[in-house]
């Protein structure tokens, strides 16, 4: 019998009614993206890890919703393609610098 691994990061989303998944995602994108950044920071700090899981969990009134996202160390392009534009749009340039540094670290070791 195999035992399921616990997720590395759990993002608990505020309990409330969302119109749909897009509403849930857009409302909570910052917390989800910070979880992704924590995962890539862990990859940087622990070179042995290759895959880490982010669990996004919420209760939407009539439905409990738990979804796991697995991230591979080699898929670091998500930092530039998905995460960075969000923080650029919100003018959080300190976070942009952190993201760029993480991306450059992985680009240089591969």
Predicted regions: what they are:
Residues 1-24:
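Long, acidic/serine-threonine-rich intrinsically disordered regions with weak helical/coil propensity
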